[in-house]
UniProtKB/Swiss-Prot annotation:
It catalyses: gamma-L-glutamyltyramine + [5-(aminomethyl)furan-3-yl]methyl diphosphate = (4-{4-[2-(gamma-L-glutamylamino)ethyl]phenoxymethyl}furan-2-yl)methanamine + diphosphate. It is an enzyme of class 2 (transferase). This is (4-{4-[2-(gamma-L-glutamylamino)ethyl]phenoxymethyl}furan-2-yl)methanamine synthase. Catalyzes the condensation between 5-(aminomethyl)-3-furanmethanol diphosphate (F1-PP) and gamma-glutamyltyramine to produce APMF-Glu. The lineage of its organism: Archaea, Methanobacteriati, Methanobacteriota, Methanomada group, Methanococci. It comes from Methanococcus vannielii.
Length: 222
């Protein structure tokens, strides 16, 4: 947050979507205004336990629309957000860096199979296109959840500039695209400004830049 306030915007929301969680950090007058404990952050829309890889699909919803029918889903650990992220081209196979639920490769074909299992099925019973549609249904739920929480933080602090970073940047762009339609909000991408490697390791990059700036300041004073 300190790096963002010093180098990008002193009044904004930093949204960092990693593999497991999404952090929503309000920055006001150059200072992080977020709550201190995870419990407080969960209670105030500043921490979401949804990420671009590890979140079980059954956590997002226990029902989805399938063939125009609201359909119950299995709560077993069959598929994760990494599967829908990969199938929908939000991440690459290389980005899918965690273990898969079934221990099989992190490729699109196996992701489609894992997604079909959420409906206690396989690609013999439902088609690949239908499995993609399941992924789309879950993706809509995922981005709606992110949007809902970011909007609440925005309304609480009156912040309209949003800085996005992390493995889930492409997901965040989709989630927050509705906000940019009004021209009131401005989305700033760390990946577009500093590159993908920085977006994937923003905390480490931020610390190195802050230390460099501090060292330069000391040298200038000496």
């Amino acid at each position: 947050a300190e790096f963002v306030s010093q180098n990008i915007d002193k009044n904004c929301i930093l949204v960092d979507m990693g593999s497991t969680t999404t952090d929503i950090i309000p920055i006001v007058d150059g200072k992080a205004a977020s709550n201190k404990t995870d419990l407080e952050r969960l209670m105030n829309n500043e921490l979401l336990y949804v990420g671009s890889l590890r979140t079980p699909l059954s956590f997002l919803s226990n029902k989805i629309m399938f063939k125009d029918t609201i359909t119950n889903v299995s709560s077993e650990y069959f598929a994760i957000t990494g599967d829908i992220s990969l199938v929908l081209d939000k991440i690459t196979e290389m980005d899918y860096s965690c273990d898969t639920p079934d221990g099989k490769p992190a490729d699109k074909r196996n992701s489609l199979i894992r997604i079909s299992k959420v409906l206690c099925s396989d690609l013999n019973q439902i088609s690949a296109d239908e499995s993609i549609n399941i992924a789309i249904e879950y993706y809509k739920i995922l981005i709606d959840l992110i949007l809902e929480n970011v909007k609440k933080v925005s309304e609480k602090y009156g912040l309209k500039n949003i800085v996005i970073t992390g493995l889930g940047e492409e997901i965040l762009k989709d989630a927050l695209s509705e906000l940019t339609k009004s021209n009131e909000f401005n989305i700033i991408s760390i990946k577009e400004r500093y590159g993908k490697d920085v977006s994937l390791a923003t905390p480490s990059f931020s610390v190195s830049i802050l230390l460099k700036n501090e060292l330069n300041a000391k040298l200038n004073r000496s």
